[in-house]
Design a protein with these regions (language model features):
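Cofactor-pocket helix-loop regions in the catalytic cores of large enzyme subunits
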Residues: 1-180
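Conserved small/polar residues in nucleotide/adenosyl-binding loops
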Residues: 183-185
Length: 185
Protein backbone atom coordinates (compact mmCIF):
# COMPACT_ATOMS: atom_id res chain seq x y z
CA UNK A 1 0.00 0.00 0.00
CA UNK A 2 2.88 2.39 0.63
CA UNK A 3 4.40 1.93 -2.81
CA UNK A 4 1.04 2.31 -4.56
CA UNK A 5 -0.02 5.31 -2.48
CA UNK A 6 3.29 7.10 -2.84
CA UNK A 7 3.53 6.31 -6.56
CA UNK A 8 0.02 7.65 -7.14
CA UNK A 9 0.86 10.86 -5.28
CA UNK A 10 4.52 11.58 -6.00
CA UNK A 11 4.94 9.67 -9.24
CA UNK A 12 7.36 7.09 -7.87
CA UNK A 13 7.03 4.56 -5.08
CA UNK A 14 9.83 5.40 -2.67
CA UNK A 15 10.30 7.31 0.54
CA UNK A 16 12.34 10.50 0.46
CA UNK A 17 14.16 11.29 3.69
CA UNK A 18 17.17 9.76 5.39
CA UNK A 19 18.25 9.72 9.02
CA UNK A 20 20.49 12.69 8.24
CA UNK A 21 17.42 14.64 7.13
CA UNK A 22 15.73 13.77 10.42
CA UNK A 23 18.72 15.19 12.32
CA UNK A 24 18.04 18.59 10.77
CA UNK A 25 14.28 18.58 11.28
CA UNK A 26 12.60 21.30 13.28
CA UNK A 27 9.44 19.23 13.85
CA UNK A 28 8.73 15.50 13.73
CA UNK A 29 5.33 13.91 13.04
CA UNK A 30 4.88 10.16 13.58
CA UNK A 31 1.69 8.29 12.68
CA UNK A 32 1.04 4.56 12.61
CA UNK A 33 4.38 3.72 14.14
CA UNK A 34 6.00 3.00 17.46
CA UNK A 35 9.75 3.42 16.92
CA UNK A 36 10.52 2.92 20.63
CA UNK A 37 9.50 -0.72 20.29
CA UNK A 38 9.62 -1.49 16.57
CA UNK A 39 12.50 0.67 15.30
CA UNK A 40 14.72 1.64 18.26
CA UNK A 41 17.57 2.88 16.06
CA UNK A 42 15.25 5.31 14.29
CA UNK A 43 13.99 6.51 17.69
CA UNK A 44 17.58 7.49 18.55
CA UNK A 45 17.66 9.68 15.43
CA UNK A 46 14.29 11.24 16.30
CA UNK A 47 15.46 11.97 19.83
CA UNK A 48 18.66 13.55 18.51
CA UNK A 49 16.61 16.03 16.45
CA UNK A 50 14.24 16.61 19.36
CA UNK A 51 17.12 17.43 21.69
CA UNK A 52 19.54 19.25 19.38
CA UNK A 53 16.97 21.26 17.41
CA UNK A 54 14.31 21.53 20.11
CA UNK A 55 12.10 19.85 17.50
CA UNK A 56 8.59 19.15 18.76
CA UNK A 57 7.68 15.47 18.48
CA UNK A 58 4.06 14.78 17.54
CA UNK A 59 2.85 11.19 17.84
CA UNK A 60 -0.55 10.18 16.43
CA UNK A 61 -1.73 6.75 17.53
CA UNK A 62 -4.91 5.19 18.89
CA UNK A 63 -2.79 3.69 21.69
CA UNK A 64 -0.53 5.49 24.13
CA UNK A 65 2.79 3.83 23.28
CA UNK A 66 6.36 4.09 24.54
CA UNK A 67 6.99 6.45 21.62
CA UNK A 68 3.98 8.57 22.61
CA UNK A 69 5.55 8.90 26.07
CA UNK A 70 8.36 10.92 24.43
CA UNK A 71 5.95 13.18 22.51
CA UNK A 72 5.49 16.88 23.03
CA UNK A 73 2.00 16.37 21.58
CA UNK A 74 0.20 13.04 21.67
CA UNK A 75 -2.85 12.77 19.40
CA UNK A 76 -5.15 9.86 20.22
CA UNK A 77 -7.47 9.18 17.27
CA UNK A 78 -9.95 6.46 16.42
CA UNK A 79 -8.47 3.49 14.56
CA UNK A 80 -9.01 3.72 10.81
CA UNK A 81 -9.67 7.47 10.79
CA UNK A 82 -6.23 8.48 9.50
CA UNK A 83 -7.50 10.24 6.37
CA UNK A 84 -10.04 12.25 8.36
CA UNK A 85 -7.29 13.21 10.83
CA UNK A 86 -4.96 14.38 8.06
CA UNK A 87 -7.74 16.25 6.23
CA UNK A 88 -8.65 17.92 9.54
CA UNK A 89 -5.06 19.06 10.00
CA UNK A 90 -4.94 20.29 6.41
CA UNK A 91 -8.21 22.18 6.94
CA UNK A 92 -6.37 24.33 9.50
CA UNK A 93 -3.35 24.68 7.22
CA UNK A 94 -5.45 25.98 4.34
CA UNK A 95 -7.82 28.01 6.53
CA UNK A 96 -4.86 29.86 8.10
CA UNK A 97 -2.87 30.07 4.84
CA UNK A 98 0.02 28.10 6.30
CA UNK A 99 0.57 26.04 3.14
CA UNK A 100 3.75 26.50 1.10
CA UNK A 101 2.17 28.33 -1.82
CA UNK A 102 5.34 28.61 -3.87
CA UNK A 103 6.20 24.91 -3.47
CA UNK A 104 2.65 23.97 -4.48
CA UNK A 105 2.71 26.35 -7.46
CA UNK A 106 6.02 25.03 -8.75
CA UNK A 107 5.81 21.32 -7.96
CA UNK A 108 2.30 20.10 -7.18
CA UNK A 109 -0.50 19.20 -9.56
CA UNK A 110 -4.00 18.60 -8.19
CA UNK A 111 -3.78 20.40 -4.85
CA UNK A 112 -6.96 22.31 -5.73
CA UNK A 113 -8.81 18.97 -5.77
CA UNK A 114 -7.30 18.07 -2.40
CA UNK A 115 -8.24 21.50 -1.04
CA UNK A 116 -11.86 20.99 -2.17
CA UNK A 117 -12.04 17.65 -0.32
CA UNK A 118 -10.34 19.08 2.77
CA UNK A 119 -12.96 21.88 2.98
CA UNK A 120 -15.46 19.21 4.04
CA UNK A 121 -13.35 18.37 7.12
CA UNK A 122 -13.79 21.33 9.45
CA UNK A 123 -13.06 20.93 13.17
CA UNK A 124 -16.53 19.65 14.13
CA UNK A 125 -16.71 16.96 11.44
CA UNK A 126 -13.13 15.87 12.05
CA UNK A 127 -13.73 15.55 15.78
CA UNK A 128 -16.94 13.60 15.15
CA UNK A 129 -15.04 11.04 13.04
CA UNK A 130 -11.62 10.95 14.74
CA UNK A 131 -12.40 11.92 18.33
CA UNK A 132 -9.67 14.60 18.22
CA UNK A 133 -10.70 18.08 19.39
CA UNK A 134 -10.42 20.86 16.80
CA UNK A 135 -8.20 22.89 19.15
CA UNK A 136 -5.62 20.09 19.22
CA UNK A 137 -5.76 19.72 15.44
CA UNK A 138 -5.07 23.43 15.03
CA UNK A 139 -2.19 23.29 17.52
CA UNK A 140 -0.57 20.34 15.71
CA UNK A 141 -1.04 21.92 12.27
CA UNK A 142 0.52 25.15 13.55
CA UNK A 143 3.49 23.30 15.04
CA UNK A 144 4.19 21.62 11.70
CA UNK A 145 3.66 24.83 9.73
CA UNK A 146 5.88 26.95 11.98
CA UNK A 147 8.76 24.48 12.32
CA UNK A 148 10.05 23.71 8.85
CA UNK A 149 11.77 21.72 7.58
CA UNK A 150 9.89 18.92 9.25
CA UNK A 151 9.81 15.17 9.08
CA UNK A 152 6.65 13.11 8.55
CA UNK A 153 7.04 9.43 9.39
CA UNK A 154 4.45 6.73 8.88
CA UNK A 155 4.69 3.01 9.42
CA UNK A 156 2.61 -0.11 9.01
CA UNK A 157 0.04 1.02 11.57
CA UNK A 158 -1.25 3.28 8.82
CA UNK A 159 -0.58 1.17 5.78
CA UNK A 160 -1.79 -2.29 6.79
CA UNK A 161 -5.49 -1.48 6.47
CA UNK A 162 -8.01 -1.97 3.70
CA UNK A 163 -7.75 1.82 3.32
CA UNK A 164 -3.94 1.86 3.65
CA UNK A 165 -3.49 3.24 0.13
CA UNK A 166 -5.78 6.16 0.99
CA UNK A 167 -3.88 6.76 4.23
CA UNK A 168 -0.58 6.88 2.38
CA UNK A 169 -1.93 9.29 -0.21
CA UNK A 170 -3.25 11.58 2.55
CA UNK A 171 0.12 11.48 4.34
CA UNK A 172 1.83 12.51 1.10
CA UNK A 173 -0.69 15.30 0.41
CA UNK A 174 -0.03 16.72 3.89
CA UNK A 175 3.69 16.86 3.16
CA UNK A 176 3.10 18.46 -0.22
CA UNK A 177 0.85 21.14 1.31
CA UNK A 178 3.61 22.19 3.69
CA UNK A 179 6.43 21.72 1.20
CA UNK A 180 8.00 19.01 3.37
CA UNK A 181 8.44 16.52 0.54
CA UNK A 182 11.55 16.07 -1.50
CA UNK A 183 13.51 18.51 0.66
CA UNK A 184 17.08 17.52 1.23
CA UNK A 185 18.30 19.38 4.26
Amino acid sequence: TTVAGVANTWGYGAMTNSYNDIHNSKAIFVIGGNPAEAHPVSLMHLMKAKEQNNAPLIVCDPRFTRTAAHADEYVRFRPGSDVALIWGLMWHIFENKWEDKEFIRQRVYGMDDVRAEVKKWGPEETERVTGVPGSQLKRVAKIMANNRPGTFIWCMGGTQHTNGNNNTRAYCAFQLALGLSLIHI
